[in-house]
From Swiss-Prot:
Keywords assigned: Acetylation, Chloroplast, Coiled coil, Cytoplasm, GTP-binding, Hydrolase, Magnesium, Membrane, Metal-binding, Nucleotide-binding, Phosphoprotein, Plastid, Plastid outer membrane, Protein transport, Receptor, Transmembrane, Transmembrane helix, Transport
Sequence positions bearing N-acetylglycine: G2
SUPFAM superfamilies (alphabetical): P-loop containing nucleoside triphosphate hydrolases
Region (G1): 581-588
Cofactor requirements of the protein: Mg(2+)
Name by which UniProt lists this protein: Translocase of chloroplast 132, chloroplastic
Family per similarity comment: Belongs to the TRAFAC class TrmE-Era-EngA-EngB-Septin-like GTPase superfamily. AIG1/Toc34/Toc159-like paraseptin GTPase family. TOC159 subfamily.
G2, as annotated region: 607-611
UniProt biased composition (Acidic residues): 39-49, 832-853
Cofactor note: Binds 1 Mg(2+) ion by subunit.
Bias type Basic and acidic residues, positions: 403-427
Coiled-coil boundaries: 13-33
Species: Arabidopsis thaliana
Phylogenetic lineage: Eukaryota, Viridiplantae, Streptophyta, Embryophyta, Tracheophyta
Amino acid sequence: MGDGTEFVVRSDREDKKLAEDRISDEQVVKNELVRSDEVRDDNEDEVFEEAIGSENDEQEEEEDPKRELFESDDLPLVETLKSSMVEHEVEDFEEAVGDLDETSSNEGGVKDFTAVGESHGAGEAEFDVLATKMNGDKGEGGGGGSYDKVESSLDVVDTTENATSTNTNGSNLAAEHVGIENGKTHSFLGNGIASPKNKEVVAEVIPKDDGIEEPWNDGIEVDNWEERVDGIQTEQEVEEGEGTTENQFEKRTEEEVVEGEGTSKNLFEKQTEQDVVEGEGTSKDLFENGSVCMDSESEAERNGETGAAYTSNIVTNASGDNEVSSAVTSSPLEESSSGEKGETEGDSTCLKPEQHLASSPHSYPESTEVHSNSGSPGVTSREHKPVQSANGGHDVQSPQPNKELEKQQSSRVHVDPEITENSHVETEPEVVSSVSPTESRSNPAALPPARPAGLGRASPLLEPASRAPQQSRVNGNGSHNQFQQAEDSTTTEADEHDETREKLQLIRVKFLRLAHRLGQTPHNVVVAQVLYRLGLAEQLRGRNGSRVGAFSFDRASAMAEQLEAAGQDPLDFSCTIMVLGKSGVGKSATINSIFDEVKFCTDAFQMGTKRVQDVEGLVQGIKVRVIDTPGLLPSWSDQAKNEKILNSVKAFIKKNPPDIVLYLDRLDMQSRDSGDMPLLRTISDVFGPSIWFNAIVGLTHAASVPPDGPNGTASSYDMFVTQRSHVIQQAIRQAAGDMRLMNPVSLVENHSACRTNRAGQRVLPNGQVWKPHLLLLSFASKILAEANALLKLQDNIPGRPFAARSKAPPLPFLLSSLLQSRPQPKLPEQQYGDEEDEDDLEESSDSDEESEYDQLPPFKSLTKAQMATLSKSQKKQYLDEMEYREKLLMKKQMKEERKRRKMFKKFAAEIKDLPDGYSENVEEESGGPASVPVPMPDLSLPASFDSDNPTHRYRYLDSSNQWLVRPVLETHGWDHDIGYEGVNAERLFVVKEKIPISVSGQVTKDKKDANVQLEMASSVKHGEGKSTSLGFDMQTVGKELAYTLRSETRFNNFRRNKAAAGLSVTHLGDSVSAGLKVEDKFIASKWFRIVMSGGAMTSRGDFAYGGTLEAQLRDKDYPLGRFLTTLGLSVMDWHGDLAIGGNIQSQVPIGRSSNLIARANLNNRGAGQVSVRVNSSEQLQLAMVAIVPLFKKLLSYYYPQTQYGQ
């Protein structure tokens, strides 16, 4: 705006011309208005009489027409209005009533327009509002709109009923029918016109001819009644058409521009400077008393009113310095026409959330403010509503003097569509609803207020918070306690939030200053990430999830640059870093590099740090304290020493804990195994897993050359760093028990020959200056910790909720191992073989078989030459006889062996009953000569095509030592020349000559894996046919060791049936599994037997169930007869997944020297295998079968597509 103020006044000649132009168009709607003329006559008379008559009840008619409003500072608003009524205004009212009647009958248009303005730049009150004057209307209504601030004083007409708005059609403003005759007024939704049945807010009338200025609250002058006339006639103008409004504005624009300047000057000459000062001071005090800004759209929706939008048309005067805003009632048609002409302009700025709207009834009870907020620049929107309390009463008084105009002239205040006032609650943030419950019930079809076309919705940040419902007032008195409590809680929360935001802003400034000192810009990746996290934390902590304004970063960056440029404000920041790591990785050298001076002596051949010590210094003006610790050792055997060192470190930092932990390791240390896990777990056990939450991984020797890749080419430096970082980060996650950890990694190079830049800073091969980056990471971690403590955010780390997920134990594997049948250990004299249980079945036939072999005639074997002379039939008979005799001989030998075992068993029992001395003599006599070690035969090795196939191998000896040590042959191992990949050792111990203990172990090692197996077993007999065994197994399962303790009891419940029951407990990793099994073996005969077993295994609430069935059918003379068939069935249920598998294996003799072996297996998932094998010692032509795969391979070379089945 300019410094001057313009008023545009329309002459009577123009008024008549406009009225004549509109007569022809108004005849169209004349018939519709005739129906409501009689009703409107009565209502308008009542409104005018109430508006003027209510003031006469308290005070006589004003006698002094020249009294000004400045003398009524302490009087109510009603008294001020009375004193301001002069005789020429009364006469003008009568003339206005007559003009209104004429206009109503002739459908006349708008009369004069008076503009009042307020200048914010030169100390004069300027209001860029062009209001219509309504001649003859005795209802009062006023409204003002400006770019910055419009304030309006309201007159209250007391009635006992609540104010309501009447919408004749239940539609929007453009469709309402309003008639004004005989000085009576009908109100409709959103136009602000008073209803004669209720208390209404009416605006004082300013006559157009006299030019007398009558200031209202805060120096605001009330517009003429033309505004109300224009608002009432909106419906008529819409029905008449769009042209009327356009013609009206076109005809009056030039004259308004010309006449505006003089009228404005005349009006403001009569307004004293004191009133201007009073008005501005009142506005300032109202703002300071905690007013609340109400959004027009949301208020209209809550009150259920239909508001009329007022569009401001900007008119520039001849000098070009001032702007006059013409306020007209805008219907949808008028909005479109004004948009086409391009007449609607404006300057709408965003309203800050701190700007609230309310009145302070105790300090300044006579003032009210009107604020407007528009979501679209260039257009000022205004919606008029009757504003009242719940019972329809207002206590509005005239303003008091205030002398603070100069402080408010430069501020910009938006125009708010709500007129709010509160007369009994001091600094009340809520705004009283403008619609009473009676109005809501009487007008259920009310629509939301229509906004002018082109106006967008305001920013969500500028919308006020939802207000608490208010209780109805009785006789003008509200529930003061309830409002006061709500105000106190809201104010306290707002103050706390503002204080937190300020502190967080200071943290931002501090971090930006740190980055500036380290030579890092705000666009650095680490800086940007920290600022993003701070903003995100503030948003999560803020009220109602409101987002942080973008100005926070800009303001913080500018403040940081100013403080660093001035160099007067010291930086209140210090950081303590504790360095941990293995011995020799460069901890002390890194500390020396950080301070750029020798703080600790280092030696490449001796251990540098032997005790915990700290050092302080300044780095770029920042106070840094570093704690150096002795080197740690990674092996398992050194963990006890590491615990002593770490406990001393823990005691040292007890009083002053570090802010950051820097764990150092070497970049060029290639280790993909878990060699560092013992050390990391020890650190976690001593300090707790939380030590890794603020840890930074530093990799020294960062200028190392990357190793060669798999194909011999050099790998990239970035890939080398990434792989090494991933290994260390993964190990730390496992040691901390939190797989979410992602510790940042920083590279370090302490060598004096490291490449440097122009500033003398050491640069890594990837171009990074490592020292500022390391310090920035350390400072960022502390800054985030400070913000976390300020915002009181939870870390969600109570103990170890995210413990490392250990692998679930393989329950099916453990259960199948449990179900396997194991032989029980026996004493040396009882090592008779596995067929002891069959001795009883064969005793009945021993006598017959013995006599059968002895009764055979003598038989003489033939030589090869003699057999060559025999015919084919003779040769067959000879071979059959030979085979029969051999079978009978083998049977006889087996019988003799069984008899010998029985005799030896009886003899051993008799020796135990004899005296000890006699038994020793018997053993000495029966003992033979000392055994001589003999070479053991070599194990068969697979064929090898290597040229260095050894012809000589050192053999092991069979000695008399009780330890049996043998090599372990692996036919498919990597060392196919030797085939020995492990060693096996066995020994049998006897405790008290009754309890056998068997110990066996095996170690297998190749280039990658190492497997260990250890088995210890013992058995005790406690009755005939009853025994109990106890065993301990240790074996490698994956990369962990599984320890199993098992026990089994066997007993013979029938002569041909044996039962067994067993338990097992397995410890694997950090899980314990327990299992139970039951087994039954039934021997039907020498040729058929069946074994059934079932069991269950559980761990961590998980269960696995399984069972096996094995049936064996063999030759009656087995093992002399080679026929054998085995049928197996297994069932496993784990996690509801049922696995069923079956297998069959059969061996059938074909002729005298050939066997056919067939195998087949199938499971319930459709997977299976079938194999057939034939071996023979005579039919060598079977080797021709090998031609088949060779022929197929040759075909694949000529027809490659056959290889893929195409």
